[in-house]
Amino acid sequence: MEIIKEKTVAITGSHTTEILSGRNDTNLLNVLFTETYLLIASLYQQGFKTFLCGMSDGFETIVAEAVLRFQKEKADIELVTVQPNSEIERDEYLLANSSLLICYCDHHDKDAMRIFERAKKGGMPTTNLHTLLTDYFANDSPAKQALQSYNNIDGFSYCKEGILLCYLYGEKPIIAPFENIEQVEQRDDKLYVTLTNELEVDAYILSE
């Protein structure tokens, strides 16, 4: 398969244990998946159609799953798995064959930070989703805390601002911010969220 560098995104990031380390947040992986999916949709609109990604547990797996889900919307988006013999070879391949780097890492993850810093030093545009979640990490609202008990649901998605009610490709996501959530209540096998405008949304609570 021919890789067009100008339309290709490289992916790297932390393992699941590193993502969750030091954070008491059962919805963080859900939020990260949503934000990754929205970013992929945005990049696709900009002409990026190929994503180079390893298959390590954690952010790389999240990206792979998000690309495959988005493939149901746009069949011409491609996921290319990268499995070189060493991390150095992986870094070289990713940087040589892409024009944008997407990652999730902080200063504790030396491996992911290594390629992130190399990309920036080389002038490659980069996006670190860890930085994009700064406000989410700082949010300690009652609504965010109340939703922590429900990390496996079907009906809406968690995002960095609150809950994503609806998203159609090419349109602005419909989001209910945490500050607009008035009540969170479980009734039988469903979760009901009441907003400050008295609108009520619900989701099924799935078994583990």
Describe the residue ranges of each PLM region.
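Acidic/glycine-enriched connector segments
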Residues: 2-143
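Generic beta-strand structural signal
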Residues: 4, 157-160, 186
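Beta-strand-connecting loop/turn residues
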Residues: 7, 161-163, 189
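Tryptophan-centered short beta-strand motifs
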Residues: 79, 173-175
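Short hydrophobic/aromatic-rich beta-strand segments that constitute the beta-sheet cores
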Residues: 103, 163-167, 193
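Acidic, Ser/Thr- and proline-rich intrinsically disordered linker/docking segments
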Residues: 145-152, 172-173, 180-208
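Conserved beta-hairpin
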Residues: 147-170
